[in-house]
Amino acid sequence: VAAAPGYGSKLARSGFGAPSLPRWCVWVQPSAAGDADRWERRWLQGVNAALDSWAKLLPIVRVGDPRRAHVRVERRRPPLRQLSGGWRASNGRSLLQVMEVKRDDRSLLEPRVTVLVSPELRALALRATALHELGHAFGLWGHSDNPVDAMAPVQGASPVLEPSEDGHLTLEWIRRQPTGFGQPVPPEIRSDDT
């Protein structure tokens, strides 16, 4: 891991390896009513722009059914998080679950990520937040030390709207690492042996 490019050595891993897939199915929460209002349109534009940025670097398939998605992007403010010094608010959050799913009569291990992006942000901050949280969802479960990187925990004065070269290198590296995700579930952890 020490020879990892970019900030690959700082990424968290699961016991199954990096939560990465060859192709990601993504669902984005549609507007509540048929026609999106101004605020919903702004949110959708920011999230879609962030998805388009990542789609230049890895295969993404947008799906209309959230049950088919590996990544679900939801329009809501993340709940407060309790830290040692008190409570902390955030603009976005990515929540990873490890799922056993049936595909073509096979049990596979897949990541399911719920991405929360607050609708109450300025347009550029919303897009930058979506870009950052989607980076986590696609396997970058860590942060860059560079404040002008989309994966920095706190960005500089201007919102970062595209993945950096370090982010690109790190993503390519993580996608080449061995992983149990997308593979048959090992018999010792299967929930149903039938």
PLM region spans:
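Short, compositionally biased low-complexity segments
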Residues: 19, 144-147
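Second-shell loop/turn segments in exported
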Residues: 30-42, 114-125, 153-161
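Metzincin-family zinc-dependent endopeptidase catalytic domain
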Residues: 41-137, 141-145
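Flexible, active-site-adjacent loop/turn segments at secondary-structure boundaries
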Residues: 9, 148-149
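Surface-exposed loop/turn and secondary-structure junction residues enriched for glycine/proline
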Residues: 14, 143, 153-154
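Post-HExxH zinc-binding segment in Zn-dependent metallohydrolases
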Residues: 150-182
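Disordered inhibitory propeptide/activation segment of secreted metzincin zinc metalloprotease zymogens
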Residues: 1-39, 96-107, 180-184, 190-194
